Design a protein with these regions (language model features):
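Extracytoplasmic/periplasmic regions of membrane proteins
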Residues: 49-52, 62, 67, 105-110, ...
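Secretory targeting and sorting signals
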Residues: 1-41, 125, 270
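Compositionally biased, intrinsically disordered low-complexity segments enriched
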Residues: 6-10, 15, 29, 64-90, ...
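Intrinsically disordered low-complexity regions specifically enriched for long asparagine
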Residues: 53-57, 66-71, 75-99, 124, ...
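C-terminal region of N-terminal signal peptides and the immediate post-cleavage residues
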Residues: 28-62, 80-89
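Gly/Pro-rich cap/lid or specificity-loop segments adjacent to the active site
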Residues: 90-387, 453-617
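Alpha/beta-hydrolase-fold enzymes
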Residues: 344-453
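N-terminal non-cleavable signal-anchor helices
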Residues: 19, 39, 52-53, 423, ...
């Protein structure tokens, strides 16, 4: 991780703390608010109810920990196979030794959104900390349900926003309008829609890698949030990973969870949740890293797969570092497309051949650490990573943002002023919303460290200092503009220490039911070839291609949203080779209000612009 400066942070730097954090670490995390959705803030203090195991002991004879809740019930939810909603009666096999977890009684209580009045229900599920030793410690997973508009829904659809480290509870808060009145209203007419916080995240048993004083310093602008882009050698990165893990160990209430936040464990949690809502098969919508989670679930539980949509897919064959490198390559290619489309325009500062333009921009950015850009009244300044983040957010969003990037680059390169660049990216006060709150900063920090914990655990320790340093040098050559946003994660995980003991799950399976994969042709976070690679590994799957820029099509592209809705409602699959066109440009009177329809990959949160779908996974 990288602290961007050693001197006290400027106002621009403090605004960029969360931006840098997620821009450098969170590859595919939360998606943009959809065009059809009504954005709503995360409900604070939502009441989470507990579960009661229906056996006094688990299979090993040890009593799992329990929490209490109200006695309100889930109602008559049925699995996609028509089974009843009582725990353990879905017809799917219960893994040996986990009977008590699969048969616990799930209770729901009302937890309405205070801002919108949306009638959510909340619950918690108890799961083993370590599935290899289910008689040991337990943890909880938090769920939030948007109940179906049908009195007799056919089942539930679970959501994951990506990350890893993204909050499904935040996603259901934000996307409720998409299901209530938007393009996925057919889903809500047939299913309950459930967001959940994966283990270690949010309202589930969390990791905590910071003190209250650390958070307050970030809120006040006295400190920057951490970044995984540590300057210097691989040795410096290893040391940073070690310090971060020690901090997590110190402040996390259940520190053992740092060894059990892998994707395999999250997928097993989902199977417990599937059983507890009474579904024979898992119905699931996963974005970005959530596609990898869905693919791992399909590999582990091929007979329990219902209707599964994997949007903006990861390539399940990539290594830990390979996903970062694939992102950077896609971003560089999108930048080249941008440059080629703008050359010849009056005042454009990157004319000449494309290679010459890329070199000119890279050289300019490389000089910003020694001579930062000024911003606004001169009290702010921007170094290389900060300016590169702003460029990236504008270039990867969509071509309609490229004139704004032209304006920002022209001012930056001709007048050494970063004001237009930051303003057009939405990173200045008044452009990105009010000041970040403590709760929002904590959510970001959890997603960042949740990302580290998951990606480090999903792969064994890999490489050595010489190979890591060689990779860092190659990034500067191969990704001349965006190399400063590529972390050396293998080195970081070596220092972090909580790494995988086995190889990643080998996804190569025929699921019982067909899986729908949605791939975006111009996706800079999870490049389109990754979706094709996933389809090749999920042999009973179908690919829907979407001709748009951005990350995450469902809820943003009207054609893709309709196809996903039809798949969940009717089981309808796209024809071979089917491509959804980009949305038509709206007329001025049809433009969405502020905060709605934010370009995929960029969502403003509390004055700190946060690139939410930007790196590795």
């Amino acid at each position: 991780m990288r602290h961007l400066r050693t001197s006290p942070p400027s106002r621009a730097a403090s605004r960029l703390t969360v931006l840098t954090l997620l821009g450098t670490l969170t590859a595919c995390s939360m998606l943009a608010t959809s065009v059809a959705a009504v954005a709503s803030p995360t409900a604070q203090g939502s009441q989470l109810t507990g579960v009661v195991l229906d056996n006094s002991t688990n299979a090993a004879g040890t009593s799992p920990s329990q929490t209490t809740g109200s006695n309100s019930s889930n109602g008559s939810s049925k699995g996609s196979g028509g089974s009843t909603g009582s725990p353990g009666s879905t017809g799917a096999k219960i893994p040996k030794g986990l009977e008590s977890f699969y048969r616990q009684k799930l209770t729901w209580t009302d937890c309405p959104d205070g801002a919108t009045g949306t009638a959510f229900q909340c619950a918690t599920v108890t799961v083993p900390l370590d599935y290899d030793h289910p008689q040991g410690k337990t943890i909880t997973v938090a769920l939030k349900k948007l109940p179906s508009t049908s009195p007799s829904p056919r089942g539930s659809v679970f959501l994951n926003p990506g990350g890893p480290g993204g909050s499904g509870i935040s996603l259901i808060n934000i996307h409720a309008g998409l299901y209530k009145t938007g393009g996925l209203s057919g889903v809500l007419a047939n299913y309950d829609v459930i967001g959940f916080d994966p283990r270690g995240i949010g309202q589930s048993t969390p990791i905590t890698c910071w003190s209250p004083e650390d958070v307050q310093a970030i809120v006040d602008g006295r400190a920057q949030a951490p970044s995984q882009l540590t300057p210097g050698s691989a040795g410096d990165i290893v040391a940073k990973g070690s310090r971060d893990a020690a901090t997590c160990q110190k402040y996390t209430e259940v520190p053992e969870i740092l060894d059990h936040m892998d994707t395999r464990s999250v997928a097993r949690d989902m199977d417990v949740m599937r059983a507890l809502v009474g579904d024979q098969d898992l119905n699931f919508l996963g974005y970005s890293y959530g596609t990898y989670l869905g693919a791992v679930y399909t590999e582990l539980f091929p007979d329990n797969v219902g209707r599964v949509v994997l949007d903006s897919a990861m390539d399940p064959t990539l290594s830990r570092q390979g996903s970062f490198e694939g992102d950077a390559a896609a971003e560089e290619q999108t930048l080249r497309t941008y440059i080629e489309s703008q050359q010849g325009q009056a005042g454009f500062p990157l004319n000449g051949s494309t290679d010459e333009a890329v070199t000119r921009l890279a050289t300019f950015l490389d000089g910003l650490d020694a001579n930062p850009l000024t911003v606004s009244d001169g009290a702010d300044s921007l170094n290389r990573a900060e300016a590169t983040n702003a460029i990236k957010e504008l270039v990867v969003a969509s071509p309609d943002k490229w004139p704004l990037l032209n304006e920002g680059l022209t001012q930056a390169m001709n007048a050494h002023d970063g004001t237009a660049l930051m303003k057009n990216a939405g990173f200045l006060p008044g452009e990105g919303g009010p000041t970040a709150t403590e709760a929002q900063i904590v959510e970001h920090l959890q997603s960042v460290y949740g990302f580290a914990a998951n990606r480090c655990l999903d792969f064994p320790d890999s490489g050595n200092q010489a190979s890591w340093d060689a990779a860092l040098a190659s990034y500067r050559r191969d990704y001349p503009v965006f190399h400063s946003l590529v972390p050396q994660h293998n080195a970081y995980c070596h220092g972090w220490g909580h790494t995988g003991k086995t190889e990643p799950v080998d996804v190569d399976v025929d699921a019982t039911n067909p899986v729908l994969v949605v791939g975006i042709l111009h996706d800079p976070a999870t490049p389109y070839p990754w979706s094709k690679a996933l389809v090749s590994k999920l042999r009973n799957s179908h690919l829907l291609s979407v001709d748009m820029y951005g990350h995450g099509a469902t809820g943003f592209n009207s054609c893709a949203t309709a196809k996903v809705n039809d798949y969940f409602v009717k089981g309808a699959l796209p024809s071979d080779g089917e491509v959804c066109a980009a949305n038509p440009e709206p007329r001025a009177e049809e433009q969405a209000p502020a905060g709605v329809g934010t370009p995929a990959g960029v969502a403003t949160l509390a004055g700190v612009a946060r690139p939410v779908g930007s790196r590795a996974g």
